[in-house]
């Protein structure tokens, strides 16, 4: 009997342990399903947010394609969840079968439980990976489809008003940013919806159009070359797109309309115009300065050229002067045949060397008189008043020019043989130089210039 009771107790303990294992397996399956559903919800939210952000910048047709992709991803993900649940249900059946076995097989049950946990985790990872891959593939397909549907950007000139376009409405109209105004613009000509612009600023376009200033502007613009009357203002009515309805005005009129609507914009326009005129004035001043600089450069070039010419002329003049000096020197030494005697003896020159013989022994003992025949007597009388005891030691009765002859005598004798006065034609003999030598040298100089008969 005691043995039976022990067996019954052991069977009860095995039954309790088996039931505990069963509850553990069920709780584990529930936690796996919860974690898997959470991961799927997160992936669906991420894909939904991405698709929504793209749909905001695209047309309604593109949003439809993205909504289809979202529905596809939502419809696919539950299927994965169902397949995971089916696999988990299979594992729970196996766990229930293991609970009916004997307690001596508990070690096998524990190893099987661990493998079941690992297989469940692998299934979760696979299902999550497959759903993420599907979502990423679908999102990539959406992006490629959207990029193919984008309207190509058009290039305009730098001064074209259509550069303010930021997004297209369709092939004919687009949205743009005109200063602080959000505007609708025609793509073919750049006209801007004046009705919407005035309405956004709290004004009505027809009030501006009725003003005298508006009529003057429109008439002036119509009269401008290259602009037709029907090309200044255009009205769009009807159609499904209410956004594009209204009156569109030429860009030159839009600036005036915006200034009429908004005082702030009018002041901004004033600042721009002031800056433009200031720059224009500066450019004009710079042009004038440039013209003056160009004139100064031209004049300076002419001056430089004239300086070069003057330098050449000076060089040529110096050369001519050298030739003249050389010619004069040759004339002074010309031979007797080239200097004929004068036909008028009274104007012929004489050179007279006088010895002063003064009692007081003044500074200079000799004098040179350069006279013509007609003035010889008067010159000698003046000399004798100053030097009463003076006497003639040499007379050159004829010379073409007594001044030139005496100048040559001074050039040849004053350094080593005579000492000259700075104010007159008086002189002294240097040491070791006698009157005889003086007379001889003067005659030699005279004869070298002109060979006169004695």
UniProtKB/Swiss-Prot annotation:
Superkingdom assignment: Viruses
Bias (Basic residues) ranges: 1-12, 65-79
Ranges of compositional bias, category Basic and acidic residues: 14-64
Compositional bias segments (type: Acidic residues): 98-123, 130-158
Domain KilA-N: 172-276
Region (Disordered): 1-159
Protein name: Putative KilA-N domain-containing protein L4
């Amino acid at each position: 009997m005691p043995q039976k009771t022990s067996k019954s107790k052991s069977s009860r303990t095995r039954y309790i342990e088996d039931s505990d294992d069963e509850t553990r397996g069920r709780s584990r399956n529930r936690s796996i399903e919860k974690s898997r559903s959470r991961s799927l919800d997160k992936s669906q939210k991420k894909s939904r947010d991405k698709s929504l952000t793209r749909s905001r910048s695209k047309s309604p047709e593109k949003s439809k394609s993205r909504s289809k992709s979202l529905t596809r991803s939502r419809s696919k993900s539950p299927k994965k969840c169902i397949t995971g649940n089916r696999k988990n249900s299979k594992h729970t059946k196996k766990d229930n079968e293991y609970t009916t076995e004997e307690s001596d097989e508990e070690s096998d049950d524990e190893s099987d439980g661990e493998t079941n946990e690992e297989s469940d985790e692998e299934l979760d990872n696979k299902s999550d990976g497959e759903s993420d891959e599907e979502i990423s593939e679908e999102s990539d397909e959406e992006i490629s489809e959207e990029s193919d549907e984008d309207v190509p950007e058009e290039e305009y000139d730098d001064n074209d008003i259509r550069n303010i376009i930021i997004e297209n409405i369709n092939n004919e109209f687009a949205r743009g940013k005109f200063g602080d105004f959000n505007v609708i613009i025609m793509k073919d000509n750049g006209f801007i919806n004046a009705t919407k612009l005035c309405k956004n600023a709290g004004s009505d376009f027809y009030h501006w159009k009725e003003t005298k200033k508006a009529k003057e502007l429109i008439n002036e613009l119509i009269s401008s070359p290259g602009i037709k009357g029907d090309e200044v203002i255009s009205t769009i009515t009807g159609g499904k797109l209410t956004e594009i309805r209204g009156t569109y005005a030429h860009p030159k009129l839009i600036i005036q309309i915006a200034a009429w609507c908004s005082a702030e914009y009018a002041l901004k326009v004033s600042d721009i115009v002031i800056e433009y005129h200031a720059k224009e004035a500066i450019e004009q001043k710079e042009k004038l300065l440039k013209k003056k600089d160009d004139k100064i450069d031209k004049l300076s070039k002419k001056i430089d050229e004239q300086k070069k010419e003057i330098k050449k002329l000076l060089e040529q003049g110096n050369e001519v002067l050298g030739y003249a000096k050389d010619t004069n020197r040759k004339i002074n030494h010309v031979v007797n045949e080239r200097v004929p005697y004068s036909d008028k003896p009274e104007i012929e020159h004489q050179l007279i060397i006088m010895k002063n013989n003064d009692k007081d022994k003044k500074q200079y003992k000799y004098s040179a008189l350069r006279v013509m025949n007609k003035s010889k007597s008067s010159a000698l009388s003046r000399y004798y008043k100053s030097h009463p005891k003076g006497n003639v030691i040499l007379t050159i009765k004829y010379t073409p020019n007594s001044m030139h002859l005496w100048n040559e005598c001074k050039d040849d004798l004053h350094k080593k043989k005579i000492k000259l006065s700075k104010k007159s034609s008086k002189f002294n003999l240097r040491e070791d130089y006698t009157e005889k030598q003086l007379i001889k040298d003067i005659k030699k100089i005279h004869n070298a210039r002109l060979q006169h008969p004695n």
